[in-house]
Amino acid sequence: MSEQNELNTLKSRFRGYFPVVIDVETAGFNAKTDALLEICAVTLQMDEDGWLKPASTIHFHVAPFEGAVLHKEALEFNGIRDPFSPLRGAVSEETALKEIYKQIRKEQKTADCSRAIMVAHNANFDHSFVMEASERARLKRNPFHPFATFDTAALSGLAFGQTVLAKACKTAGIAFDNKEAHSALYDTERTAELFCEIVNKWKKLGGWPLFESQTEEIDKSQN
């Protein structure tokens, strides 16, 4: 692979990390006590010219774990009126995360990345729920970095002057339907588009690849 082509890889662009966009819908704000009700993951890929774009999508409705707290206001907000309805087709936290992690590890390996890193809007919230659900399910092979994330709320505030997902998308020229919002599937797909737009915009502005002199300085600091 040529030096230029090497720079146009996820591995080089994100220091060995494999970015995965996540969104969750929950029954509250406390990741330890409140139910995880829906989760979606969108993986990303980089084309041969170095442009970032969405790859695959995996989505699950999730059944509340035993003893989970369900806050009425949260359910009204996300529109999940009956978390126990069989019509939701919900699976356990363990099943959802195992399938998501399986897909992530497969694509991460193909991209030759060392670890997955979560991309999310207000990422601390989604990250905390995924980590707690992994602990409850006793999943030892969690592909995500334990604390590092890419937060599109912060990134879009820098790039577009907007931190609310809907407003950031509209400012970036990404269609956003407020009626579809607060579905993990819809929000994850829009967040993925937003993150790709930010990364690609930085490339268009000349921010990536780094100049050779910058790369040399980084290499020296690591030796």
Swiss-Prot record:
InterPro entries: Exonuclease_RNaseT/DNA_pol3 (IPR013520), RNase_T (IPR005987), RNaseH-like_sf (IPR012337), RNaseH_sf (IPR036397). Mg(2+) 1 binds at residue 23. The record marks 29, 77, 125, 147 as: Important for substrate binding and specificity. GO terms for cellular component: cytosol. Residues 20-195 form the Exonuclease domain. Disulfide bonds: none annotated. GO terms for molecular function: 3'-5' exonuclease activity; magnesium ion binding; nucleic acid binding; RNA exonuclease activity, producing 5'-phosphomonoesters. Pfam families: RNase_T (PF00929). Its EC number is 3.1.13.-. Its cofactor is Mg(2+). The keyword Transmembrane helix does not apply. The active site is at residue 182. Trims short 3' overhangs of a variety of RNA species, leaving a one or two nucleotide 3' overhang. Responsible for the end-turnover of tRNA: specifically removes the terminal AMP residue from uncharged tRNA (tRNA-C-C-A). Also appears to be involved in tRNA biosynthesis. Homodimer. This is Ribonuclease T. The lineage of its organism: Bacteria, Pseudomonadati, Pseudomonadota, Gammaproteobacteria, Vibrionales.
